From Swiss-Prot:
The enzyme's E.C. designation: 3.1.26.4
Keyword Metal-binding: yes
Origin species: Rickettsia canadensis (strain McKiel)
Protein keywords: Cytoplasm, Endonuclease, Hydrolase, Manganese, Metal-binding, Nuclease
Protein name: Ribonuclease HII
Taxonomic lineage from the root: Bacteria, Pseudomonadati, Pseudomonadota, Alphaproteobacteria, Rickettsiales
Length: 196
């Protein structure tokens, strides 16, 4: 049975709906990125789904289509701010900023996951990137944005292979930390003792 990715957009069809997703909650290095997307119900782009279920090439193509055809915004919270306020609060802050930065004010904000927000417009949907087209589109924009940021940082610190692992705790990344220590972009709040 195929899931209707517009089920939530249809449920709230009388409202301006934005979908939000984040990229970068789990990595050892780099920022967390949240993106918000307001889809145009008269111009549905085919092929949009959870960014993790798409090839890199397909994600790139859809990113270009989404950012060319829909209203969108992105918010980036640095690794240092993550260390100051914790990853959950940093993610929530990024989501709130992404919604606020849209050029149109959403009346309903669909957010992937189970985070709770004080703003009553925010509706958290577990596995939302598999259930809402808006959230799936936002997942693509967030992932591509963060991957590009990590690619840029990788030129400064190639030994951590961020161009390949995006800062996640892969075996090679952990070996690089053991060999070279932490870079200025590593999250100091992460418990590295389990790796080293």
């Amino acid at each position: 049975m195929e899931i209707d990715l517009l089920q939530y957009e249809k449920k709230y069809q009388e409202y301006i709906v934005a979908g939000i997703d984040e990229a970068g909650r789990g990595p050892l290095a780099g920022p967390v990125v949240a993106s918000a997307v307001v889809i145009d119900n008269t111009n549905i782009i085919t092929g949009i789904k959870d960014s993790k279920k798409l090839s890199k090439r397909k994600r790139e193509l859809l990113y270009e289509q989404i950012t060319s055809n829909y209203i969108w915004s992105t918010a980036i919270i640095s690794h240092t701010e993550i260390d100051e306020i914790n990853i959950l609060e940093a993610t929530k802050k990024a989501c709130s900023i992404a919604a606020a930065n849209l050029t149109i004010k959403p009346e309903i904000v669909l957010v992937d996951g189970n985070m709770q927000f004080n703003d009553k417009r925010f509706v958290s949907i577990i596995k939302g990137d598999n259930l809402s087209l808006s959230i799936a589109a936002a997942s693509i924009v967030a992932k591509i944005t963060r991957d590009r940021l990590m690619l840029d940082l990788s030129t400064e610190f190639p030994q951590y292979l961020w161009y390949k692992n995006s800062g996640y705790g892969t075996k090679e990344h952990i070996q690089a930390i053991n060999t070279h220590g932490l870079s200025p972009y590593h999250r100091k709040s992460f418990r590295y003792s389990c790796f080293i």
